[in-house]
């Protein structure tokens, strides 16, 4: 949370959930991985951009979360913060223009398959640069209706909301990005059962 201090207000709700398993989807520099490791018995961190190194004592699953398990193209941008499975991603990094400089094929995994591998999560943080709706489409198991989610939305809050409704969530907390240079539609969504 060091890069997103305005999210600290939600920490008590994260701490209030069962503490067995947390997932950090889009781990990037590992800030959330480290914080979640202090709160949860197990943390699964996924980060497909190999420029992003995990914090000491942690490892990253290098797959990307998507609607289907298989392979997809990863669009690496000049800023690793903006790497995405989407060829066009205009939201994030303030008003800076970030170009795709390299494409790579990466393995993908659904949230359902992650649950089969690791067990059901109690908390899921998602920050995958616009691919949130596609990733959530791969969550169909009942366990995804019983956990807490914090999703960074990059202009797709309506689609994320539809996925959350499909999972049975009724009340969503929408957290607008407070930075004056934040792009329109750059926000977080927190839900709990």
Describe the role of every protein-language-model region.
Residues 1-193:
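Phosphate/nucleotide-binding beta-alpha loop and adjacent structural elements of enzyme active sites
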